[in-house]
């Protein structure tokens, strides 16, 4: 396939002027062969495997970035859910394993490591419960370890005992980490995927290879500029512009993924098409929606605009790569998106509207700061609502919520870097405590029976 000079110039512009980057190259690593009944032996095995397989990742990313002139922002590791790997130890805490993950990730120079996780959509094993109860201390005593809990699925329903425990875990983490920052590294999922390269929800699924390369691209700024410079008048034409631009973005990610796999001698897994914003001006998903004709993200019509965007990105990306996977859509993390921050500060973008938007976008309620006085059962209720959307619609949904101790509505919290800052958003005054405390399981919906 010949490449026109105009296409080369277009790619250079995407990088130089529109904040285009490859957001992450993530190596997924299977840890089943590290299992030992001795937790010290387990920790030693985990450290050795991660540092052996991941030792060249950062250098490879630098070489590829220099070769193609494409910024590769993060290099990350995901591992098999630790609740599965640590079960044989019968330990009453897995904090030491989190600390081992932290040391291993720092030793090879990656930015985050995910997989301090438990999959409890249908029930909790003793190991799952130990892991979840270890999360607050693990987040407090590590820097770059990320944790996730899958509490529901379309096939299993929603495990409300796990939802209750997840709410309590998030609240406890907020209380013992500065400004609740530990909660920025915890995601609670429904229908979690096994090949997600993005943090904080990445883990290496049991059905994956021993090691795999997954790539996440990002180009909100590219899409916004494409829309602003197009002659699109109808929404049909808008969708076409998004689709064609997503194709171009995806081709770059595919190239980087295939090259990284070749250099590292690790199979290429998937390319995640998700539009991942940053707090930088010109790198916002909210501003794409506004470029479609909304005066501000969060006003009426926002959910429809986001649905159009998400679907068109998928269609364009699927044409460009046979390896599309992960979450693949649009992320709407409030603190990480300059346009979302502005909309939330104006009061137009509310928690309720964000919940509606999650029914049509990539993940869920992401990087939302709430008052520190928010009770655990309210957090559990928010998680249950979000999980219900995912369960009924057969899609991945998630909650990454930060109760900021000592702060209330009208104030804001600064996380720094890619995590940005967030205004404290109000939650409902009514109580769901009795509902959450009932426990049990919300049964799987009728659409789960597909065989």
From Swiss-Prot:
Pfam families: DUF711 (PF05167)
Recorded family membership: Belongs to the UPF0210 family.
NCBIfam families: PRK05313.1
Subunit structure: Homodimer.
PANTHER family (alphabetical): UPF0210 PROTEIN MJ1665, UPF0210 PROTEIN SPR0218
Protein name: UPF0210 protein APJL_1516
